[in-house]
Amino acid sequence: MLEEINYDTKLFGLIGKNIKYTLSPYIHNFSFTTLGINAVYLVFDLDEMKFNRIINGLLEIAEGLNVTIPYKEEVMKYLDNTDTYSTRIQAVNTIYKKSGYNTDYLAIKNLVRKKIGNMSGYECYVYGAGGAAKAAAFALSELGCSSISIVNRTNLRANELVELLNKNGYNASIKENCNSTSNIVVVNSTPNPSVVPENCIQKSELVIEFVYKPVETELIKNAKKYGIKYIDGLEILVNQAVEAEKIWFNKSVSDEKIIEYLYARKLVW
């Protein structure tokens, strides 16, 4: 973080609700210092009433913002424009000068390419139907996933996501649980790492976890136990932050350097 805030200091921040746990200010303030950027990153923890009252003001004074639960979809109507990916996904998690982007989507594509590469022939099960689920479902579909199954507590949100995916030419449906026997990729985009049954994990080629505190959730522990490839929530958090900084500054600190810093500060375990 900057030792001194001055007239030229740029404002960045995270908008969400009940986000006391977030690591985003540590990640971005570390990056700003490392890159020599005169900027500060703050957290704006807003209930719905406060969000509606101050979002336009924040968009005017902030150089860039990140957006998390529950505002990834709601924020779009306040923006001047959105890029191709976030428009299709209908969710934004990064803003630069009132333009919206989705770096969750970019992070999933980046990380899955490293772990597996082409997804042709894989069946993908996405637990959850919110903004993160949308980003993951679109990323996996674009990497070639043959089908996307949405598993969610309520059918209303699941139906909306399935319709959105099918409208974009992908093969999506609602399932109560995973019932395939091979070539499965499982994504947990919910706050509950226990939502994915162990027998589903056993059949998977890759599991993807959005929860990052702790890094080794029950889902990740089971993936390790059965020798399954995995992408943990910290990898996603850091990579989407790096992609956001590329949008803001056309440069960033490496994923590895940020993760090393977070562990050194004992901010993750």
Curated annotation (Swiss-Prot):
Top-level enzyme category: oxidoreductase
EC numbers for this chain: 1.1.1.25
GO MF, any single term: shikimate 3-dehydrogenase (NADP+) activity
Protein's GO biological process: amino acid biosynthetic process; aromatic amino acid family biosynthetic process; chorismate biosynthetic process; shikimate metabolic process
Source organism: Saccharolobus islandicus (strain L.S.2.15 / Lassen #1)
Active site: K72
Summary of the function given for this chain in its UniProt record: Involved in the biosynthesis of the chorismate, which leads to the biosynthesis of aromatic amino acids. Catalyzes the reversible NADPH linked reduction of 3-dehydroshikimate (DHSA) to yield shikimate (SA).
Keywords: Amino-acid biosynthesis, Aromatic amino acid biosynthesis, NADP, Oxidoreductase
Binding positions for shikimate per the UniProt entry: T22, L23, S24, T68, N93, D104, Y212
Annotated gene: aroE
Assembly: Homodimer.
Pfam families (UniProt xref): Shikimate_DH, Shikimate_dh_N
Protein name in UniProt: Shikimate dehydrogenase (NADP(+))
CDD domains: NAD_bind_Shikimate_DH
Similarity comment: Belongs to the shikimate dehydrogenase family.
Domain of life of the organism encoding this protein: Archaea
Binding site for NADP(+): G128, A129, G130, G131, A132, N152, R153, T154, N155, L156, R157, F210, G233
Pathway the protein takes part in: Metabolic intermediate biosynthesis; chorismate biosynthesis; chorismate from D-erythrose 4-phosphate and phosphoenolpyruvate: step 4/7
